Structure formats: structure tokens, C-alpha cells
């Protein structure tokens, strides 16, 4: 059921960016988590929900380099319908428990 405590939420992560041959790490925000989905035994056309959000892009200027680096930032996160135009909406291979323990 919906008893899982792992919902969709923003998470701060560090990513590497490169410009002018210089690499730096910056902090950004991504969407992370699981969305409730009943997986019936029969094939149906239920709308699959994924953890996604509103994204914007920011620019980081590395010292000594005139070329800025654009990187994504999640502004908010929620369980939304899976968009096959920009996301893999198929099943994950293998066994994925509905409420994994991390």
C-alpha cells in the first residue's frame, strides 16, 4: 500500500562541471524518491507516476574562464505522469521491492 515513507523530494548533490579544460564541483538539486504505483497482475493502461519536478538552469562561471557552464536545478519535486518524450517509462529489470529498506 501507500505505507512507504520514501516519497518524492528534492535532494542536494554535487556534480562536476567543466569549462576551458578546468573541472569544478558545484552543488545543485535533483528530484529523488519513489512514487506509489499499483502493479496489477494484468496488463492495463494505468498512468505511471515518476518523481520529477520543475527544472530551471543556472550558469556557473569558473574563475579564469570566460565561458559559463549551464547546469540543471530542480525547483520543486512531485509525483507526476511519466512523459515518454523525455523519460524512460518502462519497467526496471529485476526485483524492485515496493518499500525498500535503505
UniProtKB/Swiss-Prot annotation:
Where in the cell does this protein reside?
A: Secreted
Any S-S bridges, and between which cysteines? 8-51, 20-65, 31-77, 35-79, 82-89
**Glycan-carrying positions:** 12
InterPro entries named in the record: Cystine-knot_cytokine, Glyco_hormone_CN, Gonadotropin_bsu, Gonadotropin_bsu_CS
SUPFAM superfamilies with a match to the protein in the record: Cystine-knot cytokines (SSF57501)
Give the PROSITE patterns listed for this entry: GLYCO_HORMONE_BETA_2
Which GO molecular function entries does the Swiss-Prot or TrEMBL record give?
hormone activity
Query: Which keywords has UniProt assigned to this entry?
Result: Disulfide bond, Glycoprotein, Hormone, Secreted
Q: Which domain of life is it from?
A: Eukaryota
Q: Cellular component terms, GO, for this chain's entry?
A: extracellular region
- Name any one Pfam family assigned in the record: Cys_knot
Q: Tell me, how does this one assemble?
A: Heterodimer of an alpha and a beta chain.
Per the entry, what this protein does is: Involved in gametogenesis and steroidogenesis.
The family classification in the record reads: Belongs to the glycoprotein hormones subunit beta family.
| Name of this chain's protein | Gonadotropin subunit beta-1
Q: Which gene encodes it?
A: cgba
Amino acid at each position: 500500500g501507500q505505507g512507504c515513507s520514501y516519497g518524492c523530494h528534492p535532494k542536494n548533490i554535487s556534480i562536476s562541471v567543466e569549462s576551458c579544460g578546468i573541472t569544478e564541483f558545484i552543488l545543485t538539486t535533483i528530484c529523488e524518491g519513489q512514487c506509489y504505483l499499483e502493479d496489477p497482475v494484468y496488463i492495463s493502461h494505468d498512468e505511471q507516476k515518476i518523481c520529477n519536478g520543475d527544472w530551471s538552469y543556472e550558469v556557473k562561471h569558473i574563475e579564469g574562464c570566460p565561458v559559463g557552464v549551464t547546469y540543471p536545478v530542480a525547483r520543486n519535486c512531485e509525483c507526476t505522469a511519466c512523459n515518454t518524450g523525455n523519460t524512460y517509462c518502462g519497467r526496471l529489470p529485476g526485483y524492485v521491492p515496493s518499500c525498500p529498506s535503505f
